[in-house]
Amino acid sequence: MSKKILILPGDGIGHEIVAEAVKVLEHVNVRHTLNMRLSFDALGGAAYEKYGSPLADETLARAREADAVLLGAVGGPQWDTIDPALRPERGLLKIRAQLGLFANLRPALLYPQLADASTLKPEVVAGLDILIVRELTGGLYFGQPRGSRISKNGEREAFDTLPYCESEIRRILKVGFEMARLRGKKLCSVDKANVLASSQLWRTVAGEMAKDYPDVTLSHMYVDNAAMQLVRYPKQFDVIVTENMFGDILSDQASMLTGSIGMLPSASLDANNKGMYEPCHGSAPDIAGQGVANPLATILSVAMLLRYGMGYIKTADAIEYAVGVVLDSGLRTADIWSEGMTKVGTVAMGDAVVAAL
């Protein structure tokens, strides 16, 4: 029985980087006889232009039917002034929520070949391997009520709400504990329990659940301290689990420890490990169409798709190994280039990975 993969290139550099990831998918599909069927649709600004909505109903239906979704990136300045409900980012938030993709896995892994690309000293980041588990469908980005109004004194005022219920907290913490159990058995739960009621509940639930994972060492850290510690001594972390907004910020920060956000994939999973896979970076409209974007994060997202979504562990390993081979050869896109390396564009980098496979 064939596996169905829905490809959503999105906006900006999305089409360029996804094209290279599709090359890799098609190559391993044939070579390893994986029997995958690929189909394409629009999300974000591209969907707004095509369907009048950042996520069309028919696209959502196709995503539900697919075994996995591969996404490029969404957003662009040309949609900044339209109705907020129709902006590209709302399509991304909606598809995550409608598919129940509550667990976002973002690895921050430093390839040894790129130690010099990090903004931190090589000895600080050498061997870095962190997994950030971010809650994706609750909290501030989805909380109600939200909106804007004119206050009693005539000022413009805007407001958001940060709610979390116990079941939402428990299911993401379970993912964090399970991932820590598979890795270094250390879990750091990041919150703001000294200020936020939602974080106080989060910390309480984490402490209760720790009793079910005696082999995992649980620690707690306030988000402001976690941001500082990620820069000061990032290798103290193994798995970090946190709520939606904190995870959004910390995972982008962690990405730069590796030298470039263009290297980092992500997986967003539901309760049955069905998910959507995408690079951690955005649509980068400033370089769209120039052929210089780094496709490796999207290619590595394909590896995560095969690993978590399809169970093709050896094929996923082969893709990750091929990326290492390409980096060993000295090929670099502009974002990870350094003196003595060979600068290549998006297509050449994708071709090199396929050749290494």
From Swiss-Prot:
Catalytic activity: (2R,3S)-3-isopropylmalate + NAD(+) = 4-methyl-2-oxopentanoate + CO2 + NADH
Record function comment: Catalyzes the oxidation of 3-carboxy-2-hydroxy-4-methylpentanoate (3-isopropylmalate) to 3-carboxy-4-methyl-2-oxopentanoate. The product decarboxylates to 4-methyl-2 oxopentanoate.
Family indicated by similarity: Belongs to the isocitrate and isopropylmalate dehydrogenases family. LeuB type 1 subfamily.
Gene3D superfamilies in UniProt: Isopropylmalate Dehydrogenase (3.40.718.10)
Highest taxon in the source lineage: Bacteria
Alphabetically ordered keywords of this record: Amino-acid biosynthesis, Branched-chain amino acid biosynthesis, Cytoplasm, Leucine biosynthesis, Magnesium, Manganese, Metal-binding, NAD, Oxidoreductase
Positions bound to NAD(+): 76-89, 282-294
Name of protein: 3-isopropylmalate dehydrogenase
HAMAP family documented for this protein: LeuB_type1
Cofactor note: Binds 1 Mg(2+) or Mn(2+) ion per subunit.
Organism of origin: Xylella fastidiosa (strain Temecula1 / ATCC 700964)
Lineage: Bacteria, Pseudomonadati, Pseudomonadota, Gammaproteobacteria, Lysobacterales
Gene: leuB
Site (described: Important for catalysis): Y141, K192
